[in-house]
Amino acid sequence: MADGGRVAQARALLQQCLHARLQVRPADGDAAAQWVEIRRGLVIYVCFFKGADTDLLPKMVNTLLNVKLSETETGKHVSILDLPGDVLIIPQATLGGRVKGRSMQYHSNSGKEEGSELYSQFVSLCEKAVANNTKSVEAGVAVAHGTYGNRQVLKLDTNGPYTHLIEF
């Protein structure tokens, strides 16, 4: 359940990192695998549920990019925009799973087309928010993202037990 007893429309898992690398396309014949990567920053895993709509996206982006979870060298907690740090966005439908017996079920997740559209717009809004942030622009902050609906390989170096689950 999200705040106030209402049913969640989305779930995001935030993971601080020193470096992350995500394979967005596997090797195929002569073509090498394609990867996106970020330096120190934030990995955002995101899942949308049935009933989610585009009205939710600005609130999600504002919350996720402005929550003070990143730690400076002096130990002060700041947002990823204030750090500034890179952002890697990964679609993660398994965040919507529920245990039934000894199996996982994903009946609450949005449909593939709806989820793909919400994910695409979420990525765009994150890119715009970073591009409109002076500190991020000056630091050359990167926003990278995975491909909705594909299995992806992730390599991640973390800098502490900084993993947070947020429902919207």
From Swiss-Prot:
Task: Give a yes or no for keyword Ion transport in this entry.
Answer: no
Q: What class of enzyme is it?
A: hydrolase
Q: Which reaction does it catalyse?
A: a D-aminoacyl-tRNA + H2O = a tRNA + a D-alpha-amino acid + H(+); glycyl-tRNA(Ala) + H2O = tRNA(Ala) + glycine + H(+); D-tyrosyl-tRNA(Tyr) + H2O = D-tyrosine + tRNA(Tyr); L-alanyl-tRNA(Thr) + H2O = tRNA(Thr) + L-alanine + H(+)
Pfam families in alphabetical order: Tyr_Deacylase
Localization, per the record, is: Cytoplasm
Give the molecular function GO annotations: Ala-tRNA(Thr) deacylase activity; D-tyrosyl-tRNA(Tyr) deacylase activity; tRNA binding
Per the record, the domain of life is: Eukaryota
Keywords from the UniProt entry: Cytoplasm, Hydrolase, RNA-binding, tRNA-binding
Q: Which GO terms describe its cellular component?
A: cytoplasm
- Where is the motif Gly-transPro motif, allows the protein to recognize chirality of D-amino acids annotated in this sequence? 160-161
This entry's Enzyme Commission designation comes to: 3.1.1.96
Q: Which InterPro entries match?
A: Daa-tRNA_deacyls_DTD, DTD-like_sf
| UniProt-listed GO biological process terms | aminoacyl-tRNA metabolism involved in translational fidelity
Family that this chain belongs to: Belongs to the DTD family.
Notes concerning its domains: A Gly-transPro motif from one monomer fits into the active site of the other monomer to allow specific chiral rejection of most L-amino acids except L-Ala. The trans conformation of the motif is maintained by Arg-151.
Complex and partners: Homodimer.
Q: What does this protein do?
A: Deacylates mischarged D-aminoacyl-tRNAs. Also deacylates mischarged glycyl-tRNA(Ala), protecting cells against glycine mischarging by AlaRS. Probably acts by rejecting L-amino acids from its binding site rather than specific recognition of D-amino acids. Catalyzes the hydrolysis of D-tyrosyl-tRNA(Tyr), has no activity on correctly charged L-tyrosyl-tRNA(Tyr). By recycling D-aminoacyl-tRNA to D-amino acids and free tRNA molecules, this enzyme counteracts the toxicity associated with the formation of D-aminoacyl-tRNA entities in vivo and helps enforce protein L-homochirality.
What name is this protein filed under?
D-aminoacyl-tRNA deacylase 2
